[in-house]
C-alpha cells in the first residue's frame, strides 16, 4: 500500500467518524435496550462483533442494556439429557424438570457467554436474570385453543411459561449507575417463588418500557417488516402497523415482534426497531446512520 493509499484510507475513516457525530450527540446519555439472539448469537464472528459494538456504545456515553435469548442452546442441552420438547404457538411447554434446565442454560451458560463477549471487548458487563434484585415478577402465561368439535375455548397448560407481571428496574439503574452493562437472562419469579421461562422479546420490551428507554433494538433473522413486494419498510407508526396486520402484510412470526414493539412504545419507549442481526455491526448501523437498516416503529 502506498502512502497516498494509506492517506485515502485514513481520510475515509475520518469521514465515517464525522458522519456519526450527530447521532453520537443524539444518543449521548440515552438508554438503549437490545434484544440479542438468533443468528447474531450463533455465528462466532457476529457474536464477537456484537460484543465490541455494545462496548463501543458504552464508551461513547450510551447506556446499553442487553436481553438475550437462548433457544438453540436450550434445545442442545435437552437433547443431551434426552428430554423431549413440546411447543404450543411457538412456546416451549415447560414442566418442573425442564424449567431447571432452562434456567441453567439461560441464566448460566448463555448469560455468562454474552457478558463475556462484552467484557473481552473492554467494557464491564454483569450477567443477571429476572430473578435477581426482583427485576421481573412473573405470572403464569395462559393460552386457549378452540375445540374443533365446537365453539368451546379450552385452556392449555404450558407449565412454567410466564410473562412479566411487574418490572422493578432498580437493579438495572444500580448497574448502569456504576458504569456496568446489564446482561439479562429471560427468567422470572412468580409471587409463589416459582421460576418461569419467559420469551426474550417480551422481557426486552417490558424492561425497555419500565426504563422509559430511548430505543429498543430487536435483533432478528429478518431484515425488518417487509411490504407485499418483499421490500423493507423503514418507518411505521403504530396505526400503520395495525393496518398492515389487518390486511395480512404482517403475519406469522413477525406478529409477536411488532406487538412487543407496539407495547414498548405505548409504555414510553421513543422508538422500537426490528433489525437484521445477521448484518455485521447491526446496532451501530441502526443508531449511527441516516434512516438505519431496520424497521422503526413509533407512536
UniProtKB/Swiss-Prot annotation:
Q: Where is this site: Transition state stabilizer?
A: 35, 257
Q: What class of enzyme is it?
A: transferase
- Report the Gene3D superfamilies cross-referenced here: Acetylglutamate kinase-like
Output one GO MF annotation: ATP binding
A GO term (biological process) for this protein? L-arginine biosynthetic process
Q: What is its EC number?
A: 2.7.2.8
* Recorded catalytic activity of this chain's protein: N-acetyl-L-glutamate + ATP = N-acetyl-L-glutamyl 5-phosphate + ADP
Q: Which Pfam families match?
A: AA_kinase (PF00696)
**According to its record, what are the GO cellular component terms?**
cytoplasm
Which UniProt keywords are present, listed alphabetically?
Amino-acid biosynthesis, Arginine biosynthesis, ATP-binding, Cytoplasm, Kinase, Nucleotide-binding, Transferase
Q: What is its main location?
A: cytoplasm
Per UniProt, subcellular location reads as:
Cytoplasm
Q: Does the keyword Oxidoreductase apply?
A: no
The positions annotated for binding substrate are: 70-71, 92, 197
InterPro entries recorded for this chain?
AceGlu_kinase-like_sf, AcgluKinase_fam, ArgB, Asp/Glu/Uridylate_kinase, Glu/AcGlu_kinase, NAGK-C
User: What is its pathway?
Assistant: Amino-acid biosynthesis; L-arginine biosynthesis; N(2)-acetyl-L-ornithine from L-glutamate: step 2/4
NCBIfam families (alphabetical): argB
The job of this chain, per UniProt, is described as: Catalyzes the ATP-dependent phosphorylation of N-acetyl-L-glutamate.
Q: Which family does it belong to?
A: Belongs to the acetylglutamate kinase family. ArgB subfamily.
What is the official name of this protein in its record? Acetylglutamate kinase
Q: What species was this sequence derived from?
A: Acidiphilium cryptum (strain JF-5)
Highest lineage ranks of the organism?
Bacteria, Pseudomonadati, Pseudomonadota, Alphaproteobacteria, Acetobacterales
Q: Which gene encodes it?
A: argB
Amino acid at each position: 500500500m502506498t502512502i497516498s493509499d494509506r492517506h485515502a484510507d485514513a481520510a475515509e475513516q475520518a469521514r465515517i467518524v464525522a458522519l456519526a457525530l450527530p447521532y453520537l450527540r443524539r444518543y449521548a446519555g440515552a438508554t438503549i435496550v437490545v434484544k440479542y439472539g438468533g443468528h447474531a448469537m450463533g455465528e462466532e464472528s457476529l457474536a464477537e462483533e456484537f460484543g465490541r459494538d455494545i462496548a463501543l456504545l458504552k464508551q461513547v456515553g450510551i447506556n446499553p442494556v442487553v436481553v438475550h435469548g437462548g433457544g438453540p442452546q436450550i434445545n442442545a442441552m435437552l437433547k443431551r439429557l434426552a428430554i423431549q420438547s413440546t411447543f404450543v404457538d411457538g412456546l416451549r411447554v415447560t414442566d418442573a424438570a425442564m424449567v431447571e434446565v432452562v434456567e441453567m442454560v439461560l441464566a448460566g451458560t448463555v448469560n455468562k457467554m454474552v457478558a463475556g463477549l462484552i467484557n473481552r471487548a473492554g467494557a464491564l458487563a454483569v450477567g443477571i436474570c429476572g430473578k435477581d434484585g426482583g427485576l421481573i415478577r412473573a405470572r403464569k402465561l395462559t393460552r386457549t385453543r378452540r375445540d374443533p368439535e365446537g365453539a368451546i375455548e379450552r385452556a392449555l397448560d404450558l407449565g412454567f411459561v410466564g410473562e412479566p407481571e411487574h418490572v422493578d428496574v432498580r437493579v438495572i439503574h444500580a448497574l448502569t449507575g456504576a458504569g456496568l452493562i446489564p446482561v439479562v437472562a429471560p427468567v422470572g419469579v412468580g409471587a409463589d417463588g416459582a421460576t418461569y421461562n419467559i420469551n426474550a422479546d417480551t422481557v426486552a420490551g417490558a424492561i425497555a418500557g419500565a426504563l422509559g428507554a430511548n430505543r429498543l433494538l430487536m435483533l432478528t433473522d429478518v431484515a425488518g417488516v417487509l411490504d407485499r413486494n418483499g421490500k423493507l419498510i423503514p418507518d411505521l407508526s403504530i396505526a400503520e402497523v395495525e393496518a398492515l396486520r389487518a390486511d395480512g402484510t404482517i403475519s406469522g412470526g413477525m406478529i409477536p415482534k411488532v406487538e412487543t414493539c407496539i407495547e414498548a412504545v405505548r409504555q414510553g419507549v421513543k422508538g422500537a426497531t426490528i433489525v437484521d442481526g445477521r448484518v455485521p455491526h447491526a446496532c451501530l448501523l441502526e443508531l449511527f446512520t441516516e434512516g438505519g437498516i431496520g424497521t422503526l416503529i413509533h407512536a
